[in-house]
UniProtKB/Swiss-Prot annotation:
Residues 142-152 are intravirion. The gene is GP4. Residues 1-21 form the signal peptide. Residues 22-120 are virion surface. The chain crosses the membrane at residues 121-141. Belongs to the arteriviridae GP4 protein family. It is found in: Virion membrane; Host endoplasmic reticulum membrane; Host Golgi apparatus membrane; Secreted. InterPro entries: Equine_arteritis_virus_Gp4. It comes from the Viruses. Glycans are attached at N33, N55, N90. This is Glycoprotein 4.
Length: 152
């Protein structure tokens, strides 16, 4: 029973990151590429570079699309959400990933081109780690842990 638990654990912790990176390609963002166009309230569209507009409300949904080769890394998007939360502490931001689509609904616009000198946005200067690198490190750590439990 212990062996079956080890095998299923290995399959789980190796398979999930591989499937995740298959459907969501792991690419780092160009964090200094700030160009974006907003088309009205509730709809934000731009080129396939770094998204530098975030629209949030007190109960907003943020849809990210990390499927394109030049799309921002998920870690970078989380930094954007964190910066928006620090800028607007009363807003509740719901983050959701979907395979094909990038849509932000809201009435509070965070323009990084104008506000990137704000101290909260200095977080964005940090390099965005690709999801694949994080997944590989996580899988290696879990493999070591499972090996210790199974064979030591």
């Amino acid at each position: 029973m212990k062996i079956y638990g080890c095998i299923s654990g290995l399959l789980l912790f190796v398979g999930l990151p591989c499937c995740w990176c298959t459907f969501y390609p792991c690419h780092a963002a160009e964090a200094r590429n700030f160009t974006y166009i907003s088309h009205g309230l509730g709809h934000v569209h731009g080129h396939e570079g770094c998204r530098n507009f975030i629209n949030v409300t007190h109960s907003a949904f943020l849809y990210l699309n990390p499927t394109t080769p030049t799309a921002p890394a998920i870690t970078h998007c989380l930094l954007l959400v964190l910066a928006a939360k620090m800028e607007h502490p009363n807003a509740t931001i719901w983050l959701q990933l979907q395979p094909f689509g990038y849509h932000v609904a809201g009435d509070v616009i965070v323009n990084l081109e104008e506000d990137k000198r704000h101290p909260y946005f200095k977080l964005l200067r940090a390099p965005a780690l690709p999801l694949g690198f994080v997944a590989i490190v996580y899988v290696l750590l879990r493999l070591v842990r499972w090996a210790q439990r199974c064979y030591l």
